[in-house]
């Protein structure tokens, strides 16, 4: 199944200055690990290069979308060139049949792929972190149903959306 997982602030912001905004949120990191461990993660080169993102992510198949030479981003298990990125992501379901495919960023890839995402794991971080990259929250709520809301703590809650 193709899924996406992302943390957003109250305005749908996901990054600032090419990195995760705001203070590190341990609850969100635990949620991310719990859901993506032993699965396939798909990300763009900006997410791969984020200094707060240890790459490759351990105990996961790491797939990198890049138009650049693979040697610039060593360590990925597979590279997608992005010629027809939605089809390439969908083809991963035929390769990794026993694992979920999690799209983990960045914003352009998330926004472009919402049409093929069957479940979206959304962490709502309370506050506005003056982000410069956003995902379209309305696109999620207009095309999916909220199936679960999980209260966490005073910093965030988790939502699972499904088509």
Walk through the language-model features, giving the residues of each.
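Enzymes that bind and transform nitrogen-containing heteroaromatic metabolites
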Residues: 1-163
């Amino acid at each position: 199944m193709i899924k996406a997982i992302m943390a957003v602030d109250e305005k749908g912001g996901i990054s600032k200055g090419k990195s995760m905004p705001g203070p590190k949120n341990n609850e969100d990191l635990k949620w991310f690990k719990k859901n993506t461990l032993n699965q396939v993660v798909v990300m763009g080169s900006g997410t791969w290069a984020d200094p707060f993102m240890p790459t490759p992510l351990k105990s996961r198949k790491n797939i990198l979308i890049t138009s650049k030479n693979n040697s610039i981003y060593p360590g990925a298990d597979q590279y997608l060139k992005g010629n027809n990125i939605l089809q390439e992501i969908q083809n991963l379901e035929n390769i990794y049949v026993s694992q979920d495919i999690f799209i983990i960023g960045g914003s352009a890839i998330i926004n472009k792929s919402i049409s093929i995402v069957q479940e979206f794991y959304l962490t709502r971080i309370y506050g506005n972190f003056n982000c410069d990259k956003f995902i379209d929250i309305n696109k999620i709520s207009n095309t999916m149903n909220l199936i679960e809301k999980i209260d966490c703590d005073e910093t965030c809650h988790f939502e699972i959306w499904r088509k």
